[in-house]
Amino acid sequence: MKTAVWAACLLLLASALPPAADAARRPHRVARHAAHQPVQPAAAPQPLHVTIMDGDSGAILHCEDCNAPMPPASMSKLMTALIVGDALLQHRITLDTRYHVSENAWRHGAMSDGSHMFLELNSEVSIRDLIQGVIVVSANDACIVLAEGLAGSESAFVALMNRRAQELGLRSAHFTNATGLPDPNHVISSADLARLARYLVANHPELYRLYGERAFTYNGHTQENRNPLLGTVAGADGLKTGHTDDSGFGLVGSAVQNGHRRILVFNGLRSMADRREAGINLMRAAFEQYATQRIARRGQQLGEAQVYLGSRATAPLVAQNDIVVGGPQAVLAGLRTHVVYAGPLRAPIAQGQVVAQLVVEGPGLQTKRFPLVSGQRIGGANWFAKAWEGLRVTFSGAH
């Protein structure tokens, strides 16, 4: 059953057919209809693994199987670009650094059936051109050249990708190559792709501007950016498309409207036309139908917890981080919050120690829990207070 929000944001397509080339690669079963039965209109494209994220706070606004690992195809090139961006920030390379196009990169990139930027065997190419090739036209040959140049081999570069994914907390991610070419162990969830995209936007502005470029010319060949949001959705400025027979057509998209950023990820569509339709409608819905609500700021006190045998009787409970909840606008109007902890707390308690949770719930919203910490250090009670407490417990329990 499709969710109500999906039905609300997509229009029915009367006669959308996949391009002939795609149909040839991906044969599909055609239903047989009796002569007197009318053919029903084609359903609107239904993507898989949908994530809509608030790019400002990182709050997930909408999730459809968004935490399940999936084959990302070329969308995983976001991590390839991030590794290059890190090296630039660390001054290990510059945009003018040149890398050699090996036979391996040429044969498995430029001579492959996948996307490439027409690199020539044994040529020397600048990082500036290579990273544009990766970001704008999804060039596999550029990915391999960068991997070999930065790490010595693609396998060593993949180790850097996986290590970086762990550092960023992308728990679903496991990469086996720098290109996104099919491999059953090359996976990441759409939610983690959204987190990766958000990190790129915030920490690599010098590279992020390339994601909005509409075309790239190299070696006499001009290729267009395949991102269907660019030029069609107001404020769209990135990020990356992906497609293999295993993954279908997917998109990591981002746009800014009225000072607010939304990040969209989905996968599993059968054609570029379907990807365009779904991408435009979902991104528009992301701004029109979803919102965020700030519950508390980092360090804000939200309650107190009883303390047993402490230097004070209660511990102030404060938000460990900003607490922001996102979702459909109608759902946010009915939010409820309450504090839970296993009490009384036992001293000593360190300042910043997680001791409780703020529970946020409401009709139509999956219950969310956020850590609360002690706002100050609380030492143990002195011997007199402990003795007095012992006497109190003893006599209060006597009959």
Tell where the protein language model's regions lie, with residue ranges.
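Domain-terminus/edge residues, biased toward the C-terminal soluble/receptor-binding domains
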Residues: 170-174, 182-187, 191-399
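Compositionally biased, proline/threonine/alanine/serine-rich low-complexity intrinsically disordered stretches
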Residues: 23-44, 328, 380, 384-391, ...
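Short, flexible loop/turn motifs enriched in small residues
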Residues: 6, 42-48, 245-249
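Generic marker of residues within folded, mature protein domains
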Residues: 13, 40, 62, 89-91, ...
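Bacterial N-terminal signal peptides that target proteins for export
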Residues: 1-7
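C-terminal segment of classical bacterial N-terminal signal peptides
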Residues: 13-20
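Active-site-adjacent loops and short helices of periplasmic peptidoglycan-processing enzymes
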Residues: 24-194, 198-203
